[in-house]
From Swiss-Prot:
Alphabetized SMART domains for the sequence: ZnF_C2H2
Entry keywords, A to Z: Activator, Metal-binding, Nucleus, Repeat, Transcription, Transcription regulation, Zinc, Zinc-finger
Protein name per the record: Zinc finger protein STAR3
Record SUPFAM superfamilies: beta-beta-alpha zinc fingers
Origin species: Oryza sativa subsp. japonica (Rice)
Region spans: Disordered: 130-173, 254-284, 372-400
Tissue spec. comment: Expressed in roots.
Originating gene: STAR3
Domain of life: Eukaryota
Length: 465
């Protein structure tokens, strides 16, 4: 009798607890439960070989304790931030940054710890998707309901709740949630998004520039090709499109019209053209900063830039300066620029540094204290013995052929000898008394001269006669 009363008391307590908490599992004898439900299949048993897939209450308790501690720390940090904001000052800016960093670290730890709880819940025995068959579950639920003194309607409600829970755990959203947290995808996604945002904040111009243009990469043969435009009839190549259009005139009258020689017409203004992204070019050389696979990629703007960059950086320097013989270039334009100042007297500083331009020398002198422009070298000392001073003797160009043929007047008799130094050879008196009509010219110009000067000149002429 005492045993029956004890059993009835346990049933009443179980019924009260069940009504208060739907998740409460009623106390029953183990043999009664095992006898009412069929034995579960082998694949439904908890895993024994894989330890981390079993539910560990100790691990979950430690994680929950850790989460509670971090939540308390987050609350303290937020309270301190609120207090500092009330008494804000300019000196508290570094402290505010440190507090923000601490808060970010705490939140990341909370997220990672909460993610570690989800796999253990999924693989536990009471949340596992490998649930008993519906018949066994229904039998066990009915037995528990009868043992607790519940009616058949409450048993059907419990069965319906369990089916809803199973359906919720079998939904695709539930699987995706566990997959993301188990594989660490959520943390990687958060970290990756934060890294992209940080790169965009650090270099917003580069991030915006990458979206504006498309990158094209030419091959080495295309870059080093001497011609880029070719005739479709004879196959002759040209460097410029204008040269090709002029060449096409020789292939027929249809290429001589103004429309054929003009540039391609632009699209009409009325039609809306789809926005075309700007083109940028990449260097085909692997490891180059101008290659699109480089971390610090810097694109090239035009095809000419690609050609010059590739020749200067990755090709042999074949063009040699003919003046100094030391400088070598791979681009002909660079050689021509060098030849403009090669061989000229360079501006020298007292420190030994030479410059091609005077303004660069003075900028160097102004930058470094104690430096000064170097003085020109002194003239060579005079030679010992008697120095002979040679008179400069005139040389006259003979002929107009442009050659170096000169008429040497030193060999002519009477030139260079005597006190006159050859002046008498070219004097007007050597031609004799010949009148070329200068007298008449003087008479005609007498009105332009003063009367005294003209009279004196006329008397001198008469006296000479």
């Amino acid at each position: 009798m005492d045993r029956d009363q004890m059993t009835n008391t346990m049933r009443d307590q179980a019924a009260n607890l069940t009504s208060m908490n739907p998740l409460f599992y009623p106390f029953m004898a183990d043999d009664a439960l095992l006898g009412m439900a069929p034995p579960p299949p082998q694949q439904l048993l908890p895993s024994v070989s894989i330890q981390h897939m079993d539910w560990s209450p100790d691990t979950m308790l430690d994680n929950l304790t850790f989460i509670e501690e971090k939540i308390r720390q987050v609350k303290d940090v937020i309270r301190s931030m609120a207090g500092r904001r009330a008494s804000s000052s300019s000196a508290a800016t570094p402290e505010q940054q440190l507090v923000n960093a601490d808060l970010t670290c705490l939140i990341v730890q909370l997220i990672s710890t909460a993610g570690s709880l989800l796999p253990s819940l999924k693989n536990s025995s009471f949340l596992s998707r490998t649930t008993p068959p519906p018949a066994a579950a229904a039998g066990a639920a009915q037995a528990v309901s009868l043992a607790a003194g519940e009616s058949s309607s409450s048993a059907r409600n419990n069965e319906t709740n369990r089916e809803d829970e199973e359906e919720q755990m079998g939904s695709p959203d539930y699987d995706e949630l566990f997959k993301v947290w188990t594989n660490g995808g959520a943390m990687d996604e958060c970290v990756g998004a934060a890294g992209d945002e940080q790169d965009a904040r650090e270099n917003p111009a580069a991030a915006a520039e990458e979206e504006k243009y498309e990158v094209l990469q030419l091959e080495e043969d295309e870059i080093l090709a001497p011609h880029t435009h070719f005739c479709g009839i004879c196959g002759k190549g040209f460097k410029r499109d204008a040269n090709l259009r002029m060449h096409m005139r020789g292939h027929g009258d249809e290429y001589k019209s103004a429309a054929a020689l003009a540039k391609p017409p632009p699209p009409p203004e009325g039609e809306e053209q789809p926005p075309q992204p700007e083109r940028r070019y990449s260097c085909p050389h692997a490891g180059c900063k101008r290659n699109r696979m480089h971390a610090s990629f810097q694109p090239l703007k035009t095809i000419l830039c690609v050609k010059n960059h590739y020749k200067r950086s990755h090709c042999e320097k074949r063009h040699v300066c003919g003046r100094c013989g030391a400088k070598r270039f791979s681009v002909m334009a660079d050689l021509k620029t060098h030849e403009k100042h090669c061989g000229r007297d360079r501006w020298l500083c007292s420190c030994g540094t030479s410059f091609s331009r005077k303004d660069k020398l003075f900028a160097h002198v102004a930058l470094f204290q104690g430096h000064a422009p170097a003085l020109p070298p002194p003239p060579p000392p005079p030679t010992s013995g008697r120095r002979r001073h040679k008179q400069e003797e005139p040389e006259f160009t003979w002929g107009g052929g442009g050659g170096n043929e000169f008429l040497d007047v030193k060999g002519i008799a009477g030139v260079g000898s005597g006190s006159g130094g050859g002046d008498e050879f070219f004097s007007a008196g050597s031609f004799g008394a010949m009148d070329f009509g200068f007298g008449q010219l003087d008479a005609s110009l007498a009105m332009l001269l003063p009367s005294e000067q003209f009279a004196g000149d006329h008397q001198e002429e008469n006296g000479d006669k």
